[in-house]
C-alpha cells in the first residue's frame, strides 16, 4: 500500500501549460521545430484540462500562471531551448521522441 501512495503523484500529473513573457519567469524554454523528426516531444493542444492527463504531450494552455503545472517560454533559436516540440494535428500522434527529456515536465 505504501508503494501505491508514493507513486500516485507521478501518475496523476497533467500538463497544464502557461506561456510567460520573459525567460526568467519560465520553468523551461521551448523551441517549436519545423519537422517532427527534429523534436523531443510531439504536442497536441487539447480543449479541456481533463484531457491533459499524464506526461504524454497533451497540453492544455491555461489563462493564469497559478493554474499551470509548468510555465514555458518560447525561444527564437533551437540552441536556447531546453525542449524542442512539434505541434501535431491529431491526439494519437502526440508523445515523446526523446525520453531523456521527460524529466523537464515532471
Regions found by a protein language model. Give the residues of each.
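Repetitive, compositionally biased segments used for assembly/scaffolding
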Residues: 14-106
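Sec-dependent N-terminal signal peptides
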Residues: 1-12
